[in-house]
Amino acid sequence: MAPSLHPLIDNGITPGSGSFAGGKLRCHCASDRVEVTLNSNVAHNHACGCSKCWKPSGSLFSIVGVVPRDAVSVTANASKLSVVDKEATIQRYGCKDCGVHLFGRIEKDHPFRGLDFVHVELSDEKGWQEPQFAGFVSSIIEQGSHPKEMDEVRAKFKALGLQTYDVLSPALMDLISTFTAQASGIRFANL
């Protein structure tokens, strides 16, 4: 039996609310918790198997979505935040004490610049967009999952109604490719 995909989806997916307007994320510290306020629901929420995203203990995947950068503000204990990996494209801000990643920001020229990556499981509020797909699924092998477990992992996602990809969803890959094409001088009509 495959280990936990993620606690938010192991027992099924709870639908979000289209009218949900955001909430607060908090780190796992017992006191003086870092608090980040999101003034928006997430988009492109998904299970991510990459090696960079923060995952709950025992989980193979993170659950991560994006919000506009201007919808994110640190509202308590900002001094406890630091960038986890300064070389990474996504500058993930984690709590120095408990290690939880509160948000990830892209500072350089990139198709996702202007969007911050967040983990809605860090919120007590309900209504966040439910996961839409699973990305970077094969990447869990690089983190120690046995290749023979992959069929079972993909079957669990399929049973949840989530398409699996070994990169991102087609819509996000199209966004990346459009950005790259435009950066190289290609122009498209009606964009």
UniProtKB/Swiss-Prot annotation:
Annotated residues for binding of Zn(2+) 1: 27, 29, 95, 98
UniProt keyword annotation of Lyase present: yes
Entry keyword set: Lyase, Metal-binding, Zinc
Pathway(s) of this molecule: One-carbon metabolism; formaldehyde degradation; formate from formaldehyde (glutathione route): step 1/3
InterPro entries assigned to the protein according to its UniProt record, in alphabetical order: CENP-V/GFA, Formald_GSH, Mss4-like_sf
EC number: 4.4.1.22
Gene3D superfamilies membership: glutathione-dependent formaldehyde- activating enzyme (gfa)
An example Gene Ontology molecular-function term: S-(hydroxymethyl)glutathione synthase activity
Pfam families listed in its UniProt record: GFA
Cofactor binding comment, as recorded: Binds 2 Zn(2+) ions per subunit.
Reported cofactor(s): Zn(2+)
UniProt xrefs under HAMAP family: Formald_GSH (MF_00723)
Name used for this protein in its record: Putative glutathione-dependent formaldehyde-activating enzyme
Lineage: Eukaryota, Fungi, Dikarya, Ascomycota, Pezizomycotina
